[in-house]
């Protein structure tokens, strides 16, 4: 319908902001009709659409990321949590969940309940068919948005994003409770490190995988005591 509207009304340029239509392939549809559109194609939008994919990509290309394991079987996830996990630990629904598909579990009991919630009860729908279990890291979270043309990346200013609901960060993650910019923790040294080891390597990795990314990439950084 959107492509029909753009065609009928001779829209010069369409900018897609929402994750869902990008992951669904709306850019491919527009391009197939010769319409100008800004955003990643379906095979590149998976970077945001699948946490398991993005974690595997970072691991393959040595881009810094928290230690993790991916699971598509809840029983195997539970075995891992009972035998190998260190707490607190983070459970993430693989797919899009409006920024809410992340659970921080303080102990095994909470983690077992989290697996049930994400993978069995499908609280986040098909987004929970696969789940990422990730090392819990403490530090300052910083968000950086960037413009990408498939090869070159230009970052915007940093932002301090507050995701958790309730006063004192007592609630669950949300799509965002508030933000301010720039972040005082995003120093010149951090910027230089990220440009060298995170930003450009991510663009290059996507191109190497045949998934050239054109659009805006969101980088969620965790600045820890170890870097």
Question: What is the meaning of each model-derived region?
Answer:
Residues 23-24, 77, 141-142:
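Short, well-ordered alpha-helical microsegments
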Residues 105-227:
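Internal nucleotide-binding/catalytic subdomain
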Residues 1-42:
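ATP-binding N-terminal substructure of ATP-dependent carboxylate-amine bond-forming enzymes
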Residues 3-4, 46-52, 166-168:
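Short, charged, surface-exposed secondary-structure boundary motifs
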């Amino acid at each position: 319908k959107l492509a029909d509207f753009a065609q009928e009304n001779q829209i010069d340029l369409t900018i897609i902001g929402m994750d869902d239509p990008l992951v669904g392939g709306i850019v491919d549809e527009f391009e197939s009709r010769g319409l100008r559109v800004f955003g990643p194609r379906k095979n590149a939008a998976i970077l945001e659409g699948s946490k398991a994919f993005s974690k595997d990509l970072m691991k393959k290309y040595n881009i810094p990321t928290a230690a993790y394991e991916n699971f598509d079987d809840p029983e195997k996830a539970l075995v891992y949590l009972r035998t190998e996990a260190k707490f607190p630990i983070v459970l993430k629904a693989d797919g899009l969940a409006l920024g809410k598909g992340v659970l921080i579990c303080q102990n095994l009991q909470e983690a077992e309940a989290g697996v049930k919630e994400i993978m069995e009860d499908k609280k986040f729908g098909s987004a929970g068919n696969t789940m990422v279990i990730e090392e819990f890291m403490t530090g300052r979270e910083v968000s950086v948005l960037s413009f990408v043309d498939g090869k070159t990346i230009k970052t915007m200013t940093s932002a301090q994003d507050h995701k958790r609901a309730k006063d004192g960060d007592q609630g669950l993650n949300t799509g965002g409770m508030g933000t301010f910019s720039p972040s005082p923790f995003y120093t010149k040294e951090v910027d230089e490190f990220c440009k060298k080891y995170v930003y450009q390597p991510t663009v290059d990795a996507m191109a190497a995988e045949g998934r050239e990314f054109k659009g805006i990439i969101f980088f969620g950084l965790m600045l820890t005591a170890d870097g």
